[in-house]
């Protein structure tokens, strides 16, 4: 089944108001914070592949994201860089999750963003979280700094985990930030957590 530019595996699972946890390579995956966070949560909910881009070459320059060759049991496999979607359910709470392993697009960014939003809308997502890490001048002798944007209820829950105050960053950013901006306009609760 196609949703935007994503090919979704069939049979398509019935998910009840899933929460999306997204990460973005390579821009905000410093120290593999996003990759490791998603991996840990995916293991705890026994995540399975839901889909991936049908034609990743529409969005990615394969001279920048290099394809790889892998040999398993003497068989060579060609692996094309892609954006992947996984899903899982927390058995204790019954909460469904969707995990977005996104890559920074090199072309047709607007179509890429529209495809991500289409997936989120198709599955009636209740919340969208983006997690990652970014370079910063933080001394090794101090605890890591976590910044982000959370609604007031969530800010109260995390207490001193994240630095208080309004975001003040100005400068280069990712086109993928438009995902959260668009989802907020659709009244989907969006949060971001970045480790520095």
Predicted features by range, described:
Residues 24-28, 100-109, 161-170:
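Flexible, glycine/proline-enriched loop segments at strand-loop-helix junctions
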Residues 95, 102-155, 179:
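Internal, conserved structured core segments that host functional sites
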Residues 137-196:
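Catalytic cores of processing enzymes, dominated by hydrolases/peptidases
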Residues 29-36, 107, 111, 170, ...:
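Conserved active-site and cofactor/substrate-binding residues in soluble primary-metabolism enzymes
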């Amino acid at each position: 089944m196609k949703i935007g530019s994503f090919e979704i595996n069939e049979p398509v699972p019935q998910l009840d108001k899933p929460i999306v946890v997204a990460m973005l390579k390579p821009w905000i995956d410093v120290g593999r914070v996003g990759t490791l966070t998603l991996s840990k949560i995916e293991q705890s909910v026994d995540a399975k592949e839901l889909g991936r881009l049908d034609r990743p070459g529409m969005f990615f320059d394969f001279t920048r994201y290099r394809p790889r060759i892998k040999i398993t049991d003497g068989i060579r496999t060609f692996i094309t860089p892609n954006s992947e979607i996984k899903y899982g359910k927390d058995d204790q709470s019954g909460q469904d999750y969707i995990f977005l392993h996104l890559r920074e697009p090199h072309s047709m960014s607007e179509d890429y963003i529209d495809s991500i939003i289409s997936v989120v809308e198709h599955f009636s997502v209740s919340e969208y979280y983006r997690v990652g890490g970014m370079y910063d001048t933080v001394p090794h002798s101090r605890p890591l700094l976590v910044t982000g944007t959370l609604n007031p209820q969530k800010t109260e829950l995390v207490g001193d985990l994240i630095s208080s105050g309004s975001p003040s960053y100005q400068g280069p950013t990712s086109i993928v930030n438009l995902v959260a901006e668009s989802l907020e306009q659709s009244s989907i609760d969006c949060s971001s957590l970045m480790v520095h």
